């Protein structure tokens, strides 16, 4: 039926009636016009596809019918088992209701009271259960008097199977009845039945039910475990996603900071370009000043050498024997020296010799300062204090003053000498540091100058090559022009003139190169 309906729907979809009478329908014969053309490839493909689908549907229909048959059989057996269970349950309740004895007694049952079973069921009941049901019916008056048996008590019939009923007394005062010959049997899943009332099919069903319950519990436990794992994984995934979002936000902030710092760096470079230019200018000025100080240092060194030679050649004692009145006339402009001269007048005769030496040294230093005109405040280099040019008090060991010096005067003179030496050493250290810095700057400037000179020489060599090429081209042009006008003397003179010019230019460049190097 399903196949016919599907085939009818397919036929309607192709525009043909289910009978297939039209000539254009697939599978139908030609209409009243005679035999039509053969089926097209599309129609044949559709027909094959439809045939395969019909075959598949037939197979599914057969399987579905088998499944329905099995389902109906299982339903029938289930109804039968339910009916048997209801009968057994009702009989057990009836026995418990009417068989409550105070002592143990025997009961007779037999097949005489059995009736033929009903046509709808009852064939699966045991003989003892049927006999008990028939006996109960007779005792209650359910059987008619002419049914073939007398209404006697079922416990007094001969030829029956003996069973017993036991009454137990519990501790609480109650009474418990146990029915024989079977005993109570409790299923592991809590379903309580009696052994004598259970058929193998019911026992198998209980076993299957217990197995299904165990599998259900196992599946439930596994499902709960998987659910817990899934929840934990979901929590971890959410946490990782939040961490990834935070990392992305931090990365964006870092990129923004980097861009901002780059912009600030560009601005800072632009602002620092002017101070760098000023520093370069100051460095150049300092270099010029250093050159001037070097020249000044050479002059001062020469003057000091002359003074040392004069000291060695003449008597030092004559140089430093000066009257206090003469000192007042020569050094009246200096305030410090005038104060010292005033004090010298008040000194004793023993201190005159030491003061004369100190005043003479100061006078010589002032004379050198006035002669060469250098300042103490500026960074000019006075002279290089080494073993050859440094004037110390040790150089005046040959001086023999006329007045004997006392111990206190010698101590004062030594302190003055140490102070002067420390002052000159401090200034020398400062000058050496300044000289080192300036020499470093000069070395840098010289390296830059050498680089520029090399570049200039390369450009000069390129210019020389270009000049040679231009002169060659000029000669070629003049030669081609002179071919038309035959004047060999003029051509020779012009060639000699150009050759002389090139030679002079080469000589000038050769003179310039040694000077540059």
From Swiss-Prot:
Keyword entries, A-Z: Coiled coil, Intermediate filament
Region (Disordered): 104-129, 330-349, 478-517
InterPro entries: IF_rod_dom (IPR039008)
Ranges for domain IF rod: 53-484
GO CC annotations, alphabetized: intermediate filament
Similarity comment: family membership: Belongs to the intermediate filament family.
Cited PANTHER family: 1-PYRROLINE-5-CARBOXYLATE DEHYDROGENASE FAMILY MEMBER, INTERMEDIATE FILAMENT FAMILY ORPHAN 2
Protein name: Intermediate filament family orphan 2
């Amino acid at each position: 039926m399903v196949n016919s309906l599907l085939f009818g729907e397919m036929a309607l979809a192709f525009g043909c009636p289910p009978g297939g009478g039209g000539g254009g329908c697939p599978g139908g014969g030609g209409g009243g016009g005679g035999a039509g053309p053969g089926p097209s490839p599309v129609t044949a493909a559709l027909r094959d596809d439809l045939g395969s689908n019909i075959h598949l549907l037939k197979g599914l229909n057969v399987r579905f019918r088998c499944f329905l048959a099995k389902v109906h059989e299982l339903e029938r057996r289930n109804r039968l088992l339910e009916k048997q269970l209801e009968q057994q349950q009702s009989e057990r309740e009836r026995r418990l209701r009417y068989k409550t004895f105070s002592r143990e007694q025997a009961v007779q049952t037999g097949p005489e009271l059995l009736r033929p079973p009903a046509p709808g069921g009852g064939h699966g009941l045991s003989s003892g259960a049927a006999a008990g049901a028939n006996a109960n019916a007779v005792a209650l008056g359910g059987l008619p008097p002419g049914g073939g048996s007398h209404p006697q008590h079922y416990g007094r019939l001969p030829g029956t199977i003996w069973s017993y009923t036991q009454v137990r007394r519990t501790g609480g005062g109650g009474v418990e009845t146990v029915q024989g010959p079977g005993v109570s049997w409790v299923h592991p899943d809590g379903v309580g039945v009696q052994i004598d009332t259970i058929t193998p099919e019911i026992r198998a069903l209980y076993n299957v039910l217990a197995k299904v319950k165990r599998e259900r519990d196992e599946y439930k436990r596994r499902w709960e475990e998987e659910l817990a794992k899934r929840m934990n994984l979901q929590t971890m995934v959410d946490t990782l996603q939040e961490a990834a979002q935070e990392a992305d936000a931090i990365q964006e902030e870092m990129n923004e900071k980097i861009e901002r710092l780059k912009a600030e760096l560009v601005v800072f470079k632009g602002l620092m370009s002017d101070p760098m230019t000023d520093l370069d200018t100051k460095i150049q000025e300092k270099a010029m000043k250093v050159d001037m100080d070097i020249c000044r240092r050479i002059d001062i060194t020469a003057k000091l050498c002359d003074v040392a030679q004069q000291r060695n050649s003449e008597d030092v004692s004559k140089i430093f024997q000066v009257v206090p009145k003469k000192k007042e006339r020569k050094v009246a402009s200096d305030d410090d020296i005038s104060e010292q001269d005033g004090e010298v007048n008040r000194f004793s005769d023993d201190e005159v010799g030491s003061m004369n030496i100190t005043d003479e040294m100061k006078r010589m230093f002032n004379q050198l300062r006035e002669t060469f005109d250098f300042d103490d405040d500026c960074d000019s280099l006075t002279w290089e204090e080494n073993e050859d040019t440094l004037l110390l008090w040790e150089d005046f060991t040959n001086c023999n003053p006329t007045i004997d010096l006392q111990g206190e005067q010698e101590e004062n003179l030594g302190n003055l000498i140490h102070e002067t030496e420390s002052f000159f050493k401090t200034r020398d250290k400062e000058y050496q540091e300044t000289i080192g810095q300036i020499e470093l700057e000069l070395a840098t400037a010289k390296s830059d100058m050498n680089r520029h000179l090399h570049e200039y020489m390369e450009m000069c060599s390129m210019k020389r090559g270009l000049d040679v090429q231009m002169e060659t081209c000029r000669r070629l042009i003049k030669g081609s022009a002179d071919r038309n006008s035959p004047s060999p003397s003029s051509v020779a003179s012009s060639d000699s003139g150009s050759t002389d010019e090139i030679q002079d230019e080469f000589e000038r460049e050769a003179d310039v190169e040694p000077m540059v190097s």
